[in-house]
From Swiss-Prot:
GO terms for molecular function: monooxygenase activity. InterPro entries: Fungal_Meroterpenoid_Isomerase, NTF2-like_dom_sf. Monooxygenase; part of the gene cluster that mediates the biosynthesis of the dimeric xanthones cryptosporioptides. The pathway begins with the synthesis of atrochrysone thioester by the polyketide synthase dmx-nrPKS. The atrochrysone carboxyl ACP thioesterase dmxR1 then breaks the thioester bond and releases the atrochrysone carboxylic acid from dmx-nrPKS. Atrochrysone carboxylic acid is decarboxylated by the decarboxylase dmxR15, and oxidized by the anthrone oxygenase dmxR16 to yield emodin. Emodin is then reduced to emodin hydroquinone by the oxidoreductase dmxR7. Belongs to the avfA family. Pathway: Secondary metabolite biosynthesis. It comes from the Eukaryota. Its EC number is 1.-.-.-. This is Monooxygenase dmxR10. The keyword Oxidoreductase applies. Signal peptide: none annotated. Gene3D superfamilies: 3.10.450.50. Keywords: Monooxygenase, Oxidoreductase. Coiled coil: none annotated.
Length: 150
């Protein structure tokens, strides 16, 4: 049985605040230790990531995003199922000329049994954006001598 609605709502608010802050620690603060992040659609071929994997990879990505901003359009919370959905777009400047980070998402959260943490994160991303962004990001990281995983 899912945790209390008020507890889940507080966790959801804290998750969104961490996403807006968008440091590795702030963004994953509400995640359980065994939380998985899944990129959707599956056709992107990105395997699920554990919290430690996300914490390792995120600094490379954040290093190229400047003036980051998150705009939330809709939040749906189904406390009886212990789930929430967030529709949002994030914006940032990048070092790739005039190319801007403009990533549209639908994020689906599953809460821990007690509702105090997020145990699963599924991120439906803008595939057209990623097809354009990741080659630029990978090239940039290779030029900097760093690994560029997505």
């Amino acid at each position: 049985m899912p945790g209390p609605a008020e507890t889940q709502a507080a966790t959801l608010a804290k998750f969104i605040e961490g996403w807006k802050t968008f440091t590795p620690e702030a963004w994953t603060e509400t995640w359980t230790d065994d939380c998985t992040q899944n990129f959707l659609p599956f056709t992107m071929g990105v395997p699920p990531r554990t919290k430690p994997e996300v914490l390792k990879l995120l600094p490379s990505l954040l290093g190229v995003l400047h003036n980051y901003k998150l705009e939330i359009y809709s939040v749906l919370h189904d406390a009886s199922k212990g789930k929430a959905a967030i529709y949002a777009t994030s914006f940032a400047d990048t070092p790739f000329g005039d190319f801007k980070w403009t990533n549209e998402y639908a994020v689906f959260l599953t809460f821990s049994e007690d509702g105090t943490q997020v145990s699963k994160l599924e991120e439906m991303v803008d595939t057209a954006f990623y097809k354009e962004f990741f080659p630029k990001f990978q090239k940039y990281m290779i030029e900097k001598g760093a690994p560029a995983n997505h």
